Amino acid sequence: MTQDEMKQAVARAAIDYVVAGEIIGVGTGSTANFFIDELGKIKDRIKGAVASSEATAERLRAHGITIFDLNDIDSMSVYIDGADEITAQGAMIKGGGAALTREKIVASVAKKFVCIADGSKLVDKLGKFPLPVEVIPMAQAVVARKLAALGGEPRLRVKDGKAVVTDNGCYIIDVLGLQIEDPATLEAQINDIVGVVTVGLFARRGADIALLGTADGVNSLSF
């Protein structure tokens, strides 16, 4: 199977975790987009969705799925999203799509986090994929120096010569070269830096289930 076919396979498999009649959380990115397309086929079975980004909300609406504001609900049964990297313990790097803060917020409300990804995202140790950190724009340089002191190589994420701006009006610093031995500790350490909105480490609230696409089909891991 191609990488896209693997993503489609895990997106279809994730439908089994959708609880009928409830509101579900939906992530952001290419694999999440495949899931949204599958969700559109069963939209009459669910009450609606909470989106982790404006892009996700737009795609959900295009399928006729009702969007709910997270402030209007107390909890949700499941949050389904992709990952840039995931370990055998369920810790993840996320944020390649610049939606890490809202993804982390929505995931925190869900009873279950189902990660969907192609099998190449399963790693022994996090850190080969650059670690995204969302920052307040005026703190960009300050935070970058702090991240460099941790042993990483911080780079402001740019597109077309301009800093990428998140849905929250913030910037993204991608940190290369970090040796992430203890994801939960590093998550707390980076989140404590003044000016950081959040870091794209999902370790303290990692995945509960991972559906990983392989050439032989979908592998399921529980954490």
Swiss-Prot record:
Protein name: Ribose-5-phosphate isomerase A
EC numbers on record: 5.3.1.6
SUPFAM superfamilies, A to Z: D-ribose-5-phosphate isomerase (RpiA), lid domain, NagB/RpiA/CoA transferase-like
PANTHER family in UniProt: RIBOSE-5-PHOSPHATE ISOMERASE (PTHR11934:SF0)
Domain of life: Bacteria
UniProt xrefs under NCBIfam families: PRK00702.1, rpiA
Enzyme class: isomerase
Family designation: Belongs to the ribose 5-phosphate isomerase family.
